[in-house]
């Protein structure tokens, strides 16, 4: 009992100690105090149970203490029951975490303190990490070009030539001799303008810099160089890019990460703690004991740490929702950002390097997360460096130290308390009501520096970054830093296990098990794709079986070729069926690279499950095919031969999947992989022995037959069939019929060769999967470390490193400066527009409840995201839409802007008093989306000009339009990067903040009456945010209606708004009215609510407002802020205003435009062609690669079929079949390559098209026609390559008629394959489904082309498929024009002599007199597919919003 009293006293002391928590706002302190007292009361109740319960608990503890150490680590007491912490259920984990961390801000601190106190009580310390770096300099290679620095086809070719010549490249500095130190238990803030080198510094410290960068200097952890331990496992780098598997839920993502990162030193520490506790006779707190033991167990599928991280990151509410992507609805952008952070801190890393973790988060959520990080740093003695763009003052105050960077140099590195004194010593002072972080970033800017000059008696001169650096080195803080670094690290002060020496946290077996578990999960989530493939294969089996129906197939020489053709077709079909594996494998590569480089798992652990788990799928698909087609076609009816065929087909399908996975691992992008996959397919097929028999190959190329997996498959299948008893009839030559058929094809091998073939296929499968694992191991993520800059730009670089990179130049546009948000009076162009009010009443929005939520017990079929939202946005009024992450801000904007593609919308939305008509509303509104979707291959200036061209009315002449574009570019400060390529997010091109500013410019240039902006300042630093908001304010001042959702506004930015709509989680309004001077209206409204804490002096009103209206404050006060608002006079006034605005003003009329689009169709088409022309010219990965493919293909075909097209060289049916096979192969492979290449290219552009279509920029037909037309010049290049390489090498007739007929036919063929690829993308929701349907198209084309099964032999019930097959008309025109008029040349066919023309007509059914009709029909296919592409673009939208 004495021990119990001591424990109670200790808990009281802990509760009192918690009141000393640093830097917690008064509002949060009030909420936390209440929660803390509640928790204390609860624990006291637990302590005052009856003696029986106490004795029972003591007996259980005594029993646990008698267990061996390992068992004791796994056993604890939870809710008075002994439990195995490895087998805690989901409910138990959730209840325990809720009990430990009921209120995040206070209870998290309490939990960390209890853990630390428990360890200190027995003399155990956490290992710590100190990071030092000295004179670190990072340089990148750059390619200097004349003109604009863009990756055009020409620049790429020249760069490749220079690369081959190994000429040295220029170098640009990124970091310039930076030095510093990060200590344990310190939370450090990294500040600086975008492009100053913050990310590079974080990567350098985390040991994750690209190997192509030139790095000098030293980085040490606890005095050890990076190459003496594994920095990736000792520290964690948290990227600013959110890369996750879209099919996985939040919980699954975190569990997977926790499992692979392991528990680090937790297990050893826990073992030591419980050993010493046993020796000292100490009984720990049951909940703390359970928690600490649970997070110390390695390799668990479901981790307690996951539940804890989800709780403190605010992800518990979306735990069972999939992450999603641009085409799939998932968690919000803010939740995705928190998941990126949680994914790494769920591990045991002692040093954290965090890159812009607050992008997309509201200020209260950012404060909460940074507060938790502060607690982790201070209590757990972690070393944490965090880069933030716009930290609010209260968030800034949480940090201990500051690193301020500019131009790749460290301007200040030291205590936060000294930084203002340092700048005051330099002559600069931060004004009142100005955030310190905003001041620190702006005082370094040439444009903004002067306003902070405090020495009025002295003349101001711009203080350069170098001058600041010199001042810092001379300051006391700078000298202290030098002294600290001069003292060697004392290695006796830390445990040896602070640094990780193991690359992976789990055993090889556990790594494999975890990867298997994830692969199974992803296969379940993608079950639709695999089911579709099986159904497709079954359907094709039925079609094939009924084409080669056994009742039409005799066992004789004439029908032997059909049996041979059906076997070959089965092989082709199963090979082509593997194509969708390309899209699946490539789509997963970015996440794989991230996790591989974090040392989650090795490449082999990822590759083996991908291979093994696809084996059952291959077996199912092979059984489906064989069981349906085998007896329908009428192969040898012996059971053993059925299973022998099944085995070969199974191995071929497994090999196909392995091949395409291997190709994906080396090619990495969808476009390159498509070309690589088609090239591999081409080589395998050409050397496979069917299109060109082994005996017909040139002698010096016959070795190629033995390196093609298809050869062994063909040997196995044909031997299995033609060596059967029913083919033993003897022919006139004395050999059996079966042998004769095999000899004609060069496949005459003994029956035992079947098993050699099967073994060879197994060998190929293993080889390809080893190659896949090697590719995954050695290839770096896509993107390049080599910048492309212009010669003019490069000449401006200071060799001493004053300028940083092509996008780091600190030169500013010529705009007037005063207050950062003061209206810009100079040069403001105001184009004519109509001011409009948008009002909405009782708006509700419902979506179908996600399956994951229903599985967790949510009963309702519909999930309501907006609840009776009523409000209005008026001209000239700048309105802010705010709320915590997940409150429904973006949802409301989407609903008002008409961007939702699903769900149910209720309520009345009016524009100017008239019901909103989306088609006309799109003309007068702009929408800056959160996701920043742009065409990747055009420049910043071109993006803005393109938007202006299509969205400004025809009355605006081109000169005015160009001036307006220039002004918008300068206003948003895009002038320095106007020639930069936009690129793909996270891969290439613009940074996050540059991309955000481009989004705003693209919408502003449309001169809208109403403009919606979804988080326009998200991802921007304080200065860039001020620039953007000044531009937005200027727009509103011209009389436009402007609405912005905003997350982390500074006081200055927040008070630039006129009105505020505040929402709480669940989609309910809690405030809708004016801000007032210095936000007085908002402050007064909430301070009048009983219990709401008063705002402190100089505190950010937006942050205070979000804090006092959070869910925990509602729970503490026992109020519903939404209900209070509904009952307020403000709500009644707003309702009255909305009703008055819902009636049209006298003398006004509804919106009406004489045309649907701002520009005429001709102008739309002109603009679209202009953009597509630029995009294509700058897409070498698409156009150069497919041109290279055509070139190589032409050479390969030319060599293999050298002069076999010469009619004089054709003497029998095999010679004719060989050259016809050449035509068939040329057509098929060039066509498939075009189709496969265009699918990912169009897929990337599709989300841009959806945005532009919503904006009403152009008719979908204008875009479609431009897209279709833009392919023609590049197809012409392909045609010329075929005509001047393959045509003469193969030996086709050099007559004008035959030459131009061949050119016409190949042109139509290449175009219809291309347009089919475009069409299939526009008809399907994602690239995987598009690939499946494309592969079905290829296989049907194969079957119905008239080559494998000639038209006269196709059953009449399938002949319609033959006539609707584009490839059949291609071969018709090819065969007819080349050989259909050869009446003089006679050859031996099947034992008789016929003219070539007669054989073509009799065997294939191709008639020369019907050639014009065939030519016309052939030309109709590209036209048909192009029209269907246009229809799909105009009618379908697979985005889920």
Curated annotation (Swiss-Prot):
It comes from the Eukaryota. PROSITE patterns: ABC_TRANSPORTER_2. Pfam families: ABC2_membrane, ABC2_membrane_7, ABC_tran, PDR_assoc. It is a multi-pass membrane protein. GO terms for molecular function: ABC-type transporter activity; ATP binding; ATP hydrolysis activity. It is found in: Membrane. The chain crosses the membrane at residues 528-548, 566-586, 600-620, 642-662, 672-692, 758-778, 1187-1207, 1215-1235, 1272-1292, 1300-1320, 1329-1349, 1357-1377, 1413-1433. ATP 1 binds at residues 192-199. Gene3D superfamilies: P-loop containing nucleotide triphosphate hydrolases (3.40.50.300). Residues 1-14 have a biased composition (Basic and acidic residues). One of its GO terms (cellular component) is plasma membrane. May be a general defense protein. Belongs to the ABC transporter superfamily. ABCG family. PDR (TC 3.A.1.205) subfamily. This is ABC transporter G family member 41. It comes from Oryza sativa subsp. japonica.
């Amino acid at each position: 009992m004495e021990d119990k009293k001591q424990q109670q006293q200790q808990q009281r002391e802990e509760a009192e100690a918690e009141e000393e928590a640093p830097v917690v706002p008064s509002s949060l302190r009030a909420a936390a105090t209440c929660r803390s007292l509640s928790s204390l009361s609860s624990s006291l109740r637990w302590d005052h149970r009856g003696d029986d319960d106490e004795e029972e608990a003591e007996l259980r503890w005594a029993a646990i203490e008698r267990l061996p150490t390992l068992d004791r680590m796994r056993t604890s007491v939870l809710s008075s029951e002994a439990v195995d912490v490895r087998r805690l259920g989901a409910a138990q984990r959730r209840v325990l975490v809720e009990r430990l961390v009921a209120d995040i801000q206070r209870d998290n601190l309490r939990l960390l303190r209890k853990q630390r106190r428990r360890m200190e009580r027995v003399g155990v310390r956490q290992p710590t990490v100190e990071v030092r770096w000295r004179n670190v300099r990072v340089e990148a290679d750059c390619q200097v070009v004349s003109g604009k620095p863009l990756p055009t086809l020409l620049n790429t070719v020249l760069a490749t030539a220079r690369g081959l010549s190994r000429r040295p490249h220029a170098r640009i500095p990124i970091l310039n001799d930076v030095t510093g130190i990060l200590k344990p238990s310190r939370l450090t803030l990294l500040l600086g303008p975008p492009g100053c080198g913050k990310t590079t510094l974080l990567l350098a410290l985390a040991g994750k810099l690209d190997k192509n960068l030139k790095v000098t200097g030293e980085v040490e952890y606890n005095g050890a160089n990076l190459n003496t331990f594994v920095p990736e496992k000792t520290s964690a780098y948290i990227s600013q890019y959110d890369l996750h598997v879209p099919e996985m839920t939040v919980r699954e993502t975190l569990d997977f990460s926790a499992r692979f990162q392991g528990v680090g030193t937790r297990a050893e520490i826990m073992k030591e703690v419980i050993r010493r506790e046993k020796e000292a006779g100490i009984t720990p707190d049951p909940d703390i004991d359970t928690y600490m033991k649970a997070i110390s167990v390695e390799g668990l599928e479901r981790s307690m740490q996951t539940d804890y991280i989800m709780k403190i990151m605010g992800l518990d509410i979306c735990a069972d929702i999939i992450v999603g992507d641009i085409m799939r609805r998932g968690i919000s952008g803010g939740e995705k950002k928190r998941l990126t952070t949680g994914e790494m801190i769920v591990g045991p890393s002692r040093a954290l390097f965090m890159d812009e973790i607050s992008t997309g988060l509201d200020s209260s959520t950012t404060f909460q997360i940074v507060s938790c990080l502060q607690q982790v740093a201070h209590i757990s003695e972690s070393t944490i460096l965090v880069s933030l763009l716009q930290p609010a003052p209260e968030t800034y105050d949480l940090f201990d130290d500051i690193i301020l960077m500019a131009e790749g140099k460290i301007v200040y590195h030291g205590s936060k308390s000294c930084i203002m004194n340092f700048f005051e010593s330099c002559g600069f002072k931060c004004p009142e009501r100005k955030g310190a972080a905003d001041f620190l970033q702006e005082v370094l800017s040439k444009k903004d520096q002067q306003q902070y000059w405090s020495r009025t008696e002295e003349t101001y001169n711009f203080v350069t970054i170098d001058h600041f650096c010199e001042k810092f080195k001379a300051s006391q803080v700078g000298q202290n830093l030098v002294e600290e670094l001069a003292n060697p690290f004392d290695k006796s002060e830390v445990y040896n296990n602070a640094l990780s020496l193991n690359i992976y946290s789990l055993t090889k077996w556990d790594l494999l098990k975890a990867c298997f578990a994830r692969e199974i999960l992803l296969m379940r989530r993608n079950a639709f794709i695999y089911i579709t493939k099986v159904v497709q294969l079954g359907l094709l089996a039925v079609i094939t079986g009924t084409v080669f129906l056994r009742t039409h197939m005799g066992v004789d020489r004439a029908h032997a070729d059909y049996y041979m053709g059906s076997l070959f077709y089965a092989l082709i079909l199963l090979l082509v069926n593997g194509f969708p594996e390309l899209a699946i494998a490539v789509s997963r590569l970015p996440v794989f690279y991230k996790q591989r480089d974090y040392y989650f798992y090795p490449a082999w652990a990822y590759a083996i499950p991908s291979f093994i788990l696809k084996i059952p799928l291959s077996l199912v698909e092979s059984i489906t095919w064989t069981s349906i087609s085998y007896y329908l076609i009428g192969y040898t009816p012996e059971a053993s031969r059925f299973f022998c065929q099944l085995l070969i087909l199974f191995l071929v399908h497994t090999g196909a999947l392995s091949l395409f996975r291997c190709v994906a691992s080396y090619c990495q992008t969808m476009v390159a992989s498509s070309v690589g996959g088609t090239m591999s397919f081409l080589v395998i097929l050409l050397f496979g022995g069917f299109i060109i028999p082994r005996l017909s190959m040139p002698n010096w190329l016959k070795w190629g037959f033995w390196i093609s997996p298809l050869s062994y498959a063909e040997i196995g299948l044909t031997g299995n069939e033609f060596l059967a008893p029913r083919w033993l009839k003897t022919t006139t030559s004395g050999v059996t019929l079966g042998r004769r058929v095999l000899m004609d094809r060069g496949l005459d091998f003994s029956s035992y060769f079947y098993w050699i073939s099967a073994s060879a296929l197994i060998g190929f499968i293993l080889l390809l999967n080893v190659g896949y694992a090697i590719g995954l191991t050695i290839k770096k993520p896509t993107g390049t470390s080599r910048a492309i800059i212009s010669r003019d730009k490069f000449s401006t670089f200071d060799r001493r490193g004053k300028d940083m990179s092509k996008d780091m130049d600190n030169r500013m546009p010529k705009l007037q400066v005063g207050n950062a948000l003061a209206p810009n009076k100079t040069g403001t162009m105001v184009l004519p527009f109509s001011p409009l009010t948008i009002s909405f009443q009782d708006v509700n929005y419902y979506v179908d409840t996600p399956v994951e939520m229903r599985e967790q017990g949510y009963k309702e079929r519909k999930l309501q995201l907006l609840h009776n939202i009523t409000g209005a946005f008026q001209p000239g009024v700048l309105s802010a839409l705010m709320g915590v992450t997940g409150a429904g801000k973006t949802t409301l904007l989407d609903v008002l802007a008409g961007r939702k593609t699903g769900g149910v919308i209720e309520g009345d939305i009016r524009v100017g008093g008239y019901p909103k008509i989306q088609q006309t509303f799109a003309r007068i509104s702009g929408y800056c989306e959160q996701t920043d979707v742009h065409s990747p291959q055009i420049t910043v200036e071109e993006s803005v000009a393109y938007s202006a061209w299509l969205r400004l009315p025809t009355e605006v002449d081109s000169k005015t339009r160009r001036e307006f574009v220039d002004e918008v570019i300068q206003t948003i400060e895009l002038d320095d990067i106007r020639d930069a390529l936009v690129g793909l997010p996270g891969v290439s091109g613009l940074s996050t903040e540059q991309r955000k500013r481009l989004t705003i410019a693209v919408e502003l240039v449309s001169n809208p009456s109403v403009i919606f902006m979804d988080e326009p300042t998200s991802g921007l630093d304080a200065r860039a945010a001020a620039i953007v908001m000044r531009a937005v304010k200027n727009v509103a001042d011209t009389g436009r209606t402007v609405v912005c959702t905003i997350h982390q506004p500074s006081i200055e930015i927040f008070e630039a708004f006129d009105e505020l709509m505040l929402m709480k989680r669940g989609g309910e309004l809690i405030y809708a009215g004016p801000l007032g001077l210095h936000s007085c209206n908002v402050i007064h409204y909430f301070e009048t609510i009983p219990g709401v804490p008063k705002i402190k002096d100089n505190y950010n009103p937006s942050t205070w407002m979000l804090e006092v209206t959070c869910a925990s404050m509602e729970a503490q006060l026992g109020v519903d802020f939404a209900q209070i608002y509904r009952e307020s006079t403000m709500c009644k006034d707003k309702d009255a205003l909305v009703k008055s605005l819902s009636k049209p003003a006298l003398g006004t009329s509804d919106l009406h435009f004489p045309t649907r689009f701002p520009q005429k169709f001709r102008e739309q088409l002109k603009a679209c062609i202009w953009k597509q022309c630029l995009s294509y010219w700058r897409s070498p990965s698409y156009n150069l690669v497919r041109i290279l493919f055509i070139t190589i293909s032409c050479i390969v075909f030319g060599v293999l079929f050298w002069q076999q097209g010469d009619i004089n060289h054709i003497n029998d049916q095999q010679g004719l079949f060989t050259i016809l096979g050449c035509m068939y192969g040329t057509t098929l492979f060039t066509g498939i390559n075009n189709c496969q290449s265009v699918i990912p290219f169009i897929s990337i552009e599709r989300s841009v098209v959806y945005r532009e279509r919503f904006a009403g920029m152009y008719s979908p037909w204008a875009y479609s026609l431009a897209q279709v037309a833009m392919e023609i010049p590049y197809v012409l290049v392909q045609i010329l390559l075929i005509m001047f390489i393959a045509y003469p090498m193969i030996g086709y007739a050099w007559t004008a008629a035959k030459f131009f007929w061949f050119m016409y036919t190949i042109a139509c063929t290449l175009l219809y394959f291309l347009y089919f690829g475009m069409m299939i993308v526009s008809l399907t929701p994602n690239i995987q489904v598009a690939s499946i349907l494309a592969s079905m198209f290829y296989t049907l084309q194969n079957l119905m082309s008239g080559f494998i099964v000639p038209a006269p032999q196709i059953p009449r019930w399938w002949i319609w498929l033959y006539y609707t097959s584009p490839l059949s008309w291609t071969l018709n025109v090819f065969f007819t024009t080349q050989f259909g008029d050869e009446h003089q040349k006679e050859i031996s066919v099947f034992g008789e002599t016929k003219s070539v023309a007669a054989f073509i007509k009799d065997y294939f059914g191709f008639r020369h007199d019907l050639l014009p009709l065939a030519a016309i029909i052939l030309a109709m296919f590209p036209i048909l597919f192009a029209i269907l592409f246009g229809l799909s673009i105009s009618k379908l939208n697979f985005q889920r919003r």
